[in-house]
Amino acid sequence: MKLTLGEAARISGGRLVGGTPGTEATRVCVDSRRARPGDLFVALPGDFADGHTFVEAALRAGAAAAMVTRPVVDLAGAPLGPLLVVEDPLAALRALGAWVRDVADPIVVGITGSTGKTSTKDLLASVAGVRFRTVAAERSHNNELGVPLTLLQTSEDTEVLVCELGARGPGQIRDLCTYVRPQIGIVTNVGVTHYEQFGSVDAIVAAKSELVASLPEGGVAVLNADDPRVAGMAGVTAAEVLTYGLDEGAPRTARPWLSGEAVEVDALGRPSFRLVRGDEHREVRLGVSGRHQVSNALAAATAGLALGMSLDEVAAGLERARSSPWRMEVTERGGVVVVNDAYNANPTSVAAALGTCAAMVPPGGRFLAVLGYMAELGV
């Protein structure tokens, strides 16, 4: 992202105070501890802290300006600046993100689902990066704040942008899609994550299908054939539908467009499998842990093929992918293997993690699970 403070003021509907319109901002930052020269620091209000408190620290770190909702002074009462004064920081970020997305004009892949969004995002970023200049969401940036921040990572040479799209209520994914405008959409699965907010699995299905329904006629919907609720979303889109799934001998009405076969898992939980598309196949050994990662890899592979990549390129990208921190993160020291999957939890992901860990225990070994509370399940 590169834009002048004058452009930022015009796009966001804000007012520049104490700055030069031609000064260039090269990055958006919402954490003053990570501020660096050239940043536009956004002072967000929060439940535990107000970003306006940290404007001075961000400017001292070299930030080009701070986006605020009111004038800010230092401890001596002197006005701080440059400031970009806006009414609503989230609305301003959304406007800036939409503008940068339109200027960069990459191919945008949106990913949603109850579980597997971040892992699929990491796998797809690695796959697309084999051929394309690719930008992907950091960590789990998938809401009304994280999605604009992801868009603002792009530049004019970005070819593929991978976005996570989350929801805690009806209409949220549809709203995100109005300015993300994905051409490819992936739905990983439907489970009971955020059941408390939705009230029923049917409502969760409807929310996740908003991504598929938002795709253009020339787009591609990538759907999990192993989840009937996801496969059923084919009926709500004008886009081409490509399915993926595991071929484990169970009867099917139709073979997935892309399938995974002969899954095996090594001592550290890392799966290998055969990637099959029509008469072609490639052997793939993942660098991430968990048998469930094969489904995420198939989703990423299908999207990679939809981007025009070869099966060889896709396989190479899958093999070099690594997990985000705290997501089935495996470390080994002194004969003890620690699997850190503490970023978030829901019944589906916990069952997958426990299954992976149990399979890693050698004969005579022990398996200890440290489990926390799972929220937003409506129970």
Question: Model-derived features: where do they sit?
Answer:
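Alpha-helical segments flanking ligand/cofactor-binding loops in enzyme cores
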Residues: 33, 56-57, 174, 202, ...
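Active-site beta-alpha connecting loops in nucleotide-dependent enzymes
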Residues: 46-49, 324-326, 342-379
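N-terminal leader/targeting and accessory segments in enzymes
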Residues: 1-95, 99
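Thr-Gly-centered strand-to-loop micro-motif
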Residues: 30-31, 43-45, 68, 136-138, ...
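Phosphate-binding loop of NTP-binding sites
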Residues: 90-225, 229-237
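Acidic, Mg2+-coordinating active-site environments of NTP-dependent enzymes
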Residues: 69-77, 186-337, 364-365
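Residue-level signal for inorganic ion chemistry
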Residues: 8, 39, 58, 96, ...
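Short, structured coil segments at secondary-structure junctions
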Residues: 12, 62, 78-80, 130, ...
